[in-house]
């Protein structure tokens, strides 16, 4: 039989539910009916029943132990919370008193200022003075507290403002040196206040560190005790041997008048071991007396059980727990069968509903898909029509653009020919002008000579010159008609060519327009053909899809038929299984009626119970022996604890007597300023203040997410471990 062990020392969270720490009272396989076994003389059933009863008793003991442990945890948490609540109430009362004192002190200060100023100054016409000195409250979290302070602040501000206005008006002009000195005085006063605040904070931290130092010393002492407890068994055996040797040596040394114990410095240890041995002996006497009393009671119970065993009737068998348990199991089986039948019917109805829903859902899905495909096809047709319209417009625009480009090119060629003819004319004109210029100097020379020396020339020379001039004149007259004729011919040819080029350009423009129209008609025909081909493809695709849908529907129909046949087979199998279950239930009822008449099985159960009692007795003896050993060890540890506590008190008094102010300051500096018991090991990133990890976790768990020193908000991510 499993023995309930003591709770382990592994740390576990405080918010553990009872269901998480309980073991299931039954296995997961208990839902199904148990498999049938043939009972041979009733032995197997009795063994199973006894094992079940043992497990149930063990589970009840385990649950009771778990409930008791959880109750102790709740008690400890309750004490801790009550202690914290008392501390919070004390701090709240202190802060309330502090605020009241500040309020009345401010009112008294303003009254004293009024008396001083009214006695020293006369009533003067006040001038408006800038009230830049009025301070504002930098507190964002509490609107009600802010309104409260504003209500208190208004009368104080009015009084102080009136006093400052009087002082400023009576003061007159202020020199810059005086203003500078006043600013220095203000800065010095502010520094003084900051230093005073720092001193107060350091004093508070010093006090917290001293408390943390005390708690740390206690923890060290506890750790030393635990270390002593964790000594091995071999060390304890060696200590017992040393104790036995020391007792023998002590007796011999006392007879001889020597004090070897004092010389070796082990007298105190031997005394403690002697006290431990005395305590163990006393405890053993008490245990022996308790064991004798238990033996007497057990003998009386054994005699009574023997008497009951000899005279057992059938009614007694019927009243036994085993018979009741077997009857309860039989009733549970019948209930399970009925429940399974009801659940089976419900499952069938649910399956039929789900099938109907599936068919309706498939039909709706197919309808939606068909509607969606038709909509998409209509949209595609509209888009195709729009595309053809856009393509035709594009082709028309391209044709117009080509015609315009061709006309522009033809105009450019005609203008180029005209320019060439004009250039030829200009060349000819320049040629003729050059000839005229060539001929003019001869005439000028011939004419200039007679003008210069006309009186000197003779008649023959004059006749020669005149004849020459007449010849030149006749030559020129002969050249001019030819020139005119050539010029006219060139002009006619040029005009004709220009007209031919213009006619050709017009013809080319007409041909390009006709070509663009023919291309447009060709492209339109191609587009119509593409549209028809696309429509044919879509119709073929729709035809193939419809054929696929028809084939799918046929496959679904065949699947439904196969499923219906399988379901009918399952229904037949379930009916047959139901019949078999009913027959089995009847057999079980007959077996249960027969079980009431079987006394032999009860005898075997009694033998099993006797064996179980013997095993329990052996287990109980072992537990008692262990308990006796543990109690003896506890007595030894109590003696050691008394000794260690006395030594602890001595060392503590020595430490406190030898401690200096610097040590106290360091102790207060290291201890947490909130709990005064733990060391500072966590720093807040936002403000830089240092506290212990437990205080920070408690504040986060209680949603008090503000620094205790500066009241600045922080989060779990702002907490960082600090190493001193």
Curated annotation (Swiss-Prot):
The gene is upl-1. GO terms for cellular component: HULC complex; nucleus. It comes from Neurospora crassa (strain ATCC 24698 / 74-OR23-1A / CBS 708.71 / DSM 1257 / FGSC 987). InterPro entries: E3_ubiquit_lig_Bre1, Znf_RING, Znf_RING/FYVE/PHD, Znf_RING_CS. Pfam families: BRE1, zf-C3HC4_3. A zinc finger (RING-type) spans 672-711. The lineage of its organism: Eukaryota, Fungi, Dikarya, Ascomycota, Pezizomycotina. Residues 241-262 have a biased composition (Polar residues). Pathway: Protein modification; protein ubiquitination. This is E3 ubiquitin-protein ligase bre1. One of its GO terms (biological process) is protein ubiquitination. Its main location: nucleus.
């Amino acid at each position: 039989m499993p023995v309930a062990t003591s709770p382990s020392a592994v740390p576990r969270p405080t918010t553990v539910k009872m269901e998480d720490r309980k073991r299931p009272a039954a296995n997961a396989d208990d839902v199904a009916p148990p498999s049938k076994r043939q009972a041979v003389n009733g032995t197997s059933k009795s063994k199973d029943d006894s094992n079940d009863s043992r497990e149930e008793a063990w589970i009840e003991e385990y649950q009771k132990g778990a409930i008791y442990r959880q109750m102790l945890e709740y008690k400890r948490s309750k004490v801790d919370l009550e202690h914290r609540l008392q501390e919070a109430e004390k701090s709240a009362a202190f802060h309330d008193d502090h605020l009241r004192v500040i309020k009345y002190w401010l009112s008294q200060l303003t009254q004293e200022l009024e008396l001083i100023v009214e006695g020293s100054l006369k009533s003067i016409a006040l001038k408006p003075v800038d009230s830049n000195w009025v301070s504002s409250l930098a507190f964002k979290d509490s609107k009600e507290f802010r309104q409260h302070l504003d209500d208190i602040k208004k009368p104080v501000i009015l009084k102080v403002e009136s006093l400052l206005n009087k002082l400023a008006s009576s003061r007159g002009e202020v020199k810059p040196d005086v203003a500078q000195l006043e600013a220095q005085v203000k800065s010095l006063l502010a520094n003084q206040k900051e230093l005073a605040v720092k001193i107060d904070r350091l004093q508070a931290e010093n006090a917290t560190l001293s408390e943390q130092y005390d708690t740390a010393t206690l923890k060290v002492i506890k750790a030393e005790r635990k270390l002593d407890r964790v000594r091995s068994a071999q060390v304890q055996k060696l200590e017992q041997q040393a104790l036995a040797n020391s007792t023998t040596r002590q007796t011999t040394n006392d007879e001889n008048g020597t004090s070897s114990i004092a010389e070796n410095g082990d007298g105190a240890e031997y005394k403690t071991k002697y006290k431990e041995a005395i305590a163990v002996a006393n405890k053993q006497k008490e245990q022996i007396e308790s064991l004798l009393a238990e033996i007497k009671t057990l003998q009386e119970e054994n005699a009574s059980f023997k008497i009951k065993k000899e005279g057992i009737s059938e009614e007694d068998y019927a009243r036994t727990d085993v018979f009741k348990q077997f009857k309860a199991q039989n009733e549970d089986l019948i209930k399970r069968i009925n429940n399974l039948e009801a659940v089976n019917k419900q499952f069938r109805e649910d399956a039929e509903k789900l099938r109907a829903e599936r068919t309706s859902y498939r039909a709706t899905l197919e309808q939606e898909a068909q509607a969606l495909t038709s909509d998409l096809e209509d949209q595609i047709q509209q888009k195709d029509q729009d595309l053809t319209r856009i393509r035709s417009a594009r082709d028309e625009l391209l044709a117009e653009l080509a015609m315009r480009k061709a006309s522009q090119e033809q105009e450019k060629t005609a203008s180029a020919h005209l320019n060439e003819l004009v250039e030829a004319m200009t060349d000819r004109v320049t040629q003729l002008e050059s000839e005229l210029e060539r001929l003019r100097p001869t005439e000028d020379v011939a004419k200039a000579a007679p003008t210069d020396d006309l009186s000197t020339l003779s008649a023959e020379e004059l006749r020669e010159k005149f004849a020459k001039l007449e010849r030149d004149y006749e030559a020129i007259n002969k050249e001019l008609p030819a020139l005119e004729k050539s010029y006219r011919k060139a002009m006619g040819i040029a005009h004709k060519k220009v007209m031919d080029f213009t006619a050709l350009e017009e013809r080319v423009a007409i041909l390009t327009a006709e070509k663009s129209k023919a291309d447009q008609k060709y492209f339109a025909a191609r587009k119509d053909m593409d549209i028809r081909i696309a429509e044919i493809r879509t119709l073929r695709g729709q035809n193939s899809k419809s054929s696929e849908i028809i084939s799918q529907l046929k496959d679904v129909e065949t699947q439904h038929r196969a499923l219906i046949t399988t379901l009918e087979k399952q229904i037949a199998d379930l009916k047959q299984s139901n019949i078999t279950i009913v027959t089995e239930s009847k057999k079980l009822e007959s077996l249960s009626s027969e079980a009431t008449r079987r006394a032999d099985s009860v005898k075997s159960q009694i033998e099993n119970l006797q064996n179980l009692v013997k095993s329990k007795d052996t287990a109980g003896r072992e537990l008692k022996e262990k308990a006796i050993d543990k109690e003896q060890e506890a007595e030894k540890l109590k003696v050691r604890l008394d000794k260690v506590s006395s030594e602890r008190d001595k060392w503590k008094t020595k430490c406190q007597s030898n401690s200096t102010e610097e040590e106290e300051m360091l102790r207060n500096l290291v201890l947490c300023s909130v709990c005064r018991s733990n060391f500072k090991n966590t720093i807040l990133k936002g403000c830089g203040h240092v506290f212990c990890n437990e205080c920070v976790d408690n504040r986060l768990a209680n949603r008090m997410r503000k620094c205790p020193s500066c009241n600045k908000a922080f989060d779990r991510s702002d907490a960082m471990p600090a190493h001193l």
